[in-house]
């Protein structure tokens, strides 16, 4: 049996690092496809919200950026409301192999939520509201959090979709078990 490629080793290392950084990670099909529970950054209108963010790592990771998307609805100029697709220049255009998965959840996404770019929106309604009616924009975010982004809402969504038994939450694994996965 041959040893894993450098790209595969890097993928495994980055996923384990994300798990060890205390993010709740649910593996879907393999270490290249998983969901991370993401909490709204403090001091932003998104504070108090909780979202599931799907991450798909391409075969050429880390030289090609991961695909990320919100699984439950979020109201934001740079996130498509229907698909959850994130318009994030750092990830989509300027990603380099120097970045890792923790950068996405500890820097890129919090910055995007704190500082939307209404000039290049995926959600035109959110962009217009952000620019012209900021108080209404903040209220709409709060409404979305109450409806779609609470722990209770996530549980209801999981029950409604019938979570697959093949999913395993990495937060349930011991550190030794998580380290074994990178071998």
UniProtKB/Swiss-Prot annotation:
GO terms for molecular function: ATP binding; ubiquitin conjugating enzyme activity; ubiquitin-protein transferase activity. The active site is at residue 87. Residues 1-150 form the UBC core domain. Residues 163-172 have a biased composition (Low complexity). Pathway: Protein modification; protein ubiquitination. One of its GO terms (biological process) is protein K48-linked ubiquitination. InterPro entries: UBQ-conjugat_E2_core (IPR000608), UBQ-conjugating_AS (IPR023313), UBQ-conjugating_enzyme/RWD (IPR016135). The modification N6-acetyllysine is found at residue 60. SUPFAM superfamilies: UBC-like. Its EC number is 2.3.2.23, 2.3.2.24. It comes from the Eukaryota. SMART domains: UBCc. Residues 173-183 have a biased composition (Acidic residues). GO terms for cellular component: cytosol; nucleus. Autoubiquitinated in vitro in the presence of NEDD4L. It catalyses: S-ubiquitinyl-[E1 ubiquitin-activating enzyme]-L-cysteine + [E2 ubiquitin-conjugating enzyme]-L-cysteine = [E1 ubiquitin-activating enzyme]-L-cysteine + S-ubiquitinyl-[E2 ubiquitin-conjugating enzyme]-L-cysteine; S-ubiquitinyl-[E1 ubiquitin-activating enzyme]-L-cysteine + [acceptor protein]-L-lysine = [E1 ubiquitin-activating enzyme]-L-cysteine + N(6)-monoubiquitinyl-[acceptor protein]-L-lysine. The keyword Transferase applies. Residues 152-183 are annotated as: Disordered. Keywords: Acetylation, ATP-binding, Nucleotide-binding, Transferase, Ubl conjugation, Ubl conjugation pathway. Interacts with MAEA and WDR26, components of the CTLH complex that contains GID4, RANBP9 and/or RANBP10, MKLN1, MAEA, RMND5A (or alternatively its paralog RMND5B), GID8, ARMC8, WDR26 and YPEL5. PANTHER family: UBIQUITIN-CONJUGATING ENZYME E2 (PTHR24068). Belongs to the ubiquitin-conjugating enzyme family. Accepts ubiquitin from the E1 complex and catalyzes its covalent attachment to other proteins. E2 ubiquitin conjugating enzyme that transfers ubiquitin to MAEA, a core component of the CTLH E3 ubiquitin-protein ligase complex. In vitro catalyzes 'Lys-11'- and 'Lys-48'-linked polyubiquitination. Capable, in vitro, to ubiquitinate histone H2A. This is Ubiquitin-conjugating enzyme E2 H. It comes from Homo sapiens (Human). The lineage of its organism: Eukaryota, Metazoa, Chordata, Craniata, Vertebrata.
